[in-house]
Amino acid sequence: MRLKGVLALFSFFTAIPIKSNASLEEIAEYSYISPLIIGISLALIESAVYVLLYRILEALAGIVLLGVVELLRGFNHLDGLLDLGDALMIKGDRERKIKALKDVEIGSGGIGLLLVYLSIQIVALLKLGFSFYTIFHLISSNVLSMTIGLYILSTISPIPESNLGKIFHNKLKGKSTVLLLELIPFISLYNIIVFLVFYMIMHKICRSLGGSSGDIAGASITLSFPLFLLTNEITNLNYSLLSILCYLFLHLH
């Protein structure tokens, strides 16, 4: 049952073709380990693809990697970003905002937030460069972004309209400390600041909507990834356990 739940994380969070008949409750139960299992797995695939692309396209490899990143995620989180953008643009009561959040049509708010995401993501991927640290930048960013999405679900009560939010909140509400502990090897002082500021912004958004949801978590994962990646690139993971290990590896060999 445990292996079934872990494998189901791949089919739920990614487009990797792993068959699973696990229920949503089983997936939610093991979702607290997905930042490590899914985050690192995605980063390794992205790194391998990027290395191959860089040999052909050099700096432009980052642009192509943008498509790879979203393909690996099956565009699931991107849908949440579009829905949240529409909800944020609605003026008025909570009911109207929730209606926009659940609406399948894409409005100007969704397109606007998508453009914000793409702008940051393109800058981050173009700045990725090619060095020994590249893979660690991607690992850290994937782990951090997945963690913040799940941390939101674990610490903020779900909106009544979100069945997925309720299930994940019930399974994760006792795992918030575990989620933070998973970050220790991958987070730097600068990314702690980004994490806290991003969480506070999303907490305020959740309050205006009446709680968290799967869409909000997905939007958080999507939008925070390029922010963490850009921070990693600028600071080179300074003062993180991962950067210390990288430094020791490079200078001892």
From Swiss-Prot:
Subcellular location: Cell membrane
GO molecular function ontology, one term from the record: adenosylcobinamide-GDP ribazoletransferase activity
Entry EC no(s): 2.7.8.26
Transmembrane segments: 33-53, 106-126, 132-152, 178-198
Main location class: membrane
Membrane topology annotation: Multi-pass membrane protein
Similarity-based family: Belongs to the CobS family.
Name of the protein described by the UniProt record: Adenosylcobinamide-GDP ribazoletransferase
